[in-house]
Amino acid sequence: MLKMGVLLFTFLVLFPLTTLELDTDRPVERHAAIKQDLKPQERRGIRLHAPRDECCEPQWCDGACDCCS
């Protein structure tokens, strides 16, 4: 009887759990598929720059920093 219980538990509970596709894997795969289709130049353009708290003198302001007051 114990062997039958172990066999049923294995095939009715554990086997279906291993064959299920996890939902958390899908967004990563979709994101990777989208990024894979991009050209290298387009991939480089997607990078977001971290905000910086730098300031520079008004004559040196070129958009990379905020002008100091």
From Swiss-Prot:
Database matches in InterPro entries? Conotoxin
Carrying 4-carboxyglutamate, the residues are E54, E57
Domain of life here? Eukaryota
Entry annotated with the keyword Secreted: yes
- Reply yes or no: does the keyword Signal apply: yes
Instruction: Please tell me in which tissues this protein is expressed.
Output: Expressed by the venom duct.
Assigned GO CC terms: extracellular region
Which residues does the propeptide include?
21-52
Disulfide cross-links? C55-C67, C56-C65, C61-C68
Q: Which UniProt keywords apply?
A: Disulfide bond, Gamma-carboxyglutamic acid, Hydroxylation, Neurotoxin, Secreted, Signal, Toxin
Compartments reported by the entry: Secreted
Q: Which Pfam families match?
A: Conotoxin
- Identify residues that carry 4-hydroxyproline: P58
Note the coiled coil stretches, chain numbering: none
Q: Span of the secretion signal?
A: 1-20
* UniProt-listed GO biological process terms: envenomation resulting in positive regulation of voltage-gated sodium channel activity in another organism
Query: Which Gene Ontology molecular-function terms are recorded?
Result: ion channel inhibitor activity; toxin activity
Family to which the UniProt record says this protein belongs: Belongs to the conotoxin M superfamily.
- Comment text on domains: The cysteine framework is III (CC-C-C-CC). Classified in the M-1 branch, since 1 residue stands between the fourth and the fifth cysteine residues.
What this chain does, per the record?
Iota-conotoxins bind to voltage-gated sodium channels and act as agonists by shifting the voltage-dependence of activation to more hyperpolarized levels. This toxin enhances tetrodotoxin-sensitive sodium current in rat dorsal root ganglion neurons.
Designated name of the protein:
Iota-conotoxin LtIIIA
